């Protein structure tokens, strides 16, 4: 995951 994705995704 990319850091921005961590904020929106939970995988």
Swiss-Prot record:
Q: Which UniProt keywords apply?
A: Copper, Metal-binding, Oxygen transport, Secreted, Thioether bond, Transport
Primary location group: secreted
Q: What GO cellular component term, any one, is given?
A: extracellular region
Indicate yes or no for the key word Manganese.
no
Q: How is the cofactor bound?
A: Binds 2 copper ions per heterodimer.
Which cofactors must be present for this protein to function?
Cu(2+)
Specify the superkingdom. Answer: Eukaryota
Q: In which tissues is it expressed?
A: Hemolymph.
Where, per UniProt, does this protein localize? Secreted, Extracellular space
Gene Ontology terms for molecular function: metal ion binding; oxygen carrier activity
* Mod. after translation: Forms a thioether bond between 2 amino acids.
> Its function?
Hemocyanins are copper-containing oxygen carriers occurring freely dissolved in the hemolymph of many mollusks and arthropods.
**Partners and quaternary state?**
Heterodidecamer composed of A and B subunits, each containing 8 globular oxygen-binding functional units. Heterogenous decameric or multidecameric structures may also be formed.
Q: What family does this chain come from, according to its entry?
A: Belongs to the tyrosinase family. Hemocyanin subfamily.
Name assigned to this protein: Hemocyanin subunit A
